[in-house]
Amino acid sequence: MSNKDLVSIIMPSYNCGRYIEASIRSVQAQTYKEWELIVVDDCNTDGSYEMVQAMQRDDQRIRVLRQERRQGAATARNWALREARGRWIAFLDSDDKWEPEKLERQIAFMEEHGYAFSYTAYQEMDEHLQPTGKLVTGPRRITTVGMYAFCWPGCLTVMYAASKVGLVQIKPIHKNNDYALWLKVIQKADCYLLDECLARYTRGRSGSITTHGYGALIKWHYFLFRHAEERSAPVSFLLMFGNLIFGVLKKLMYIKKL
């Protein structure tokens, strides 16, 4: 396996035993075969650690790391990123899935245009893995200003070129840590949309950010800008408020019915 062609896939895992096997199977079903999947177990208690270990024994492209104590997805992703060996970095949460051609289509898109940072459209599934009938896309190009305005990319769709972006590490915040990553990566490269539905996002699982109300979202966005990004209180408030406005815009412009 050549690092020149390798995709390192980052997957934090905490008590997703109901979904994680299907998530990993969607990686194994990729038409692009040069990948490593780095699963970071965040002290699972539902048997999913043993499940992934069994899958690792059958497929050496799967690597399992286990945190000594529960530290959250940000710390898990940071560790996986330090361990990653690939030219490309991709992300998949342990309750989401990819379409078989996801990696192949996205790499071809980035190589054809010389892009270092990209994302794709995806469809939403409910917690029972049934389609909600919603397709989520986004702006064709996201600049630094655009990324601060709103977290447009779905985590399960993002890919960037490690050789151009370098090692990315974020502060150990408990929510919006994927957004914190994109705010780091966008400093190195604009983000471009491959407007094809290449992933399936599981919405509404207990504990996921989509199950909380607007009050919690406001608090977490302020915390992201104030503490992870170390912005002043007034700037953090303005960025938080802007995110609320652009969140409405996303619903109007970029969430479509299938």
Please name every model-derived segment.
Residues 26, 33, 41-51, 69, ...:
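A conserved acidic beta->alpha catalytic loop
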Residues 82, 134-216, 220-221:
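Conserved nucleotide-sugar donor-binding catalytic segment
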Residues 15-29:
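Short, well-formed alpha-helical segments that are part of the catalytic scaffolds
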Residues 89:
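Short aromatic/hydrophobic "clamp" motif used to bind/position activated sugar donors
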Residues 5-8, 36, 180:
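Cell-envelope/extracellular polymer assembly enzymes that use nucleotide-activated donors
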Residues 101-132:
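Conserved donor NDP-sugar-binding/catalytic core segment of glycosyltransferases
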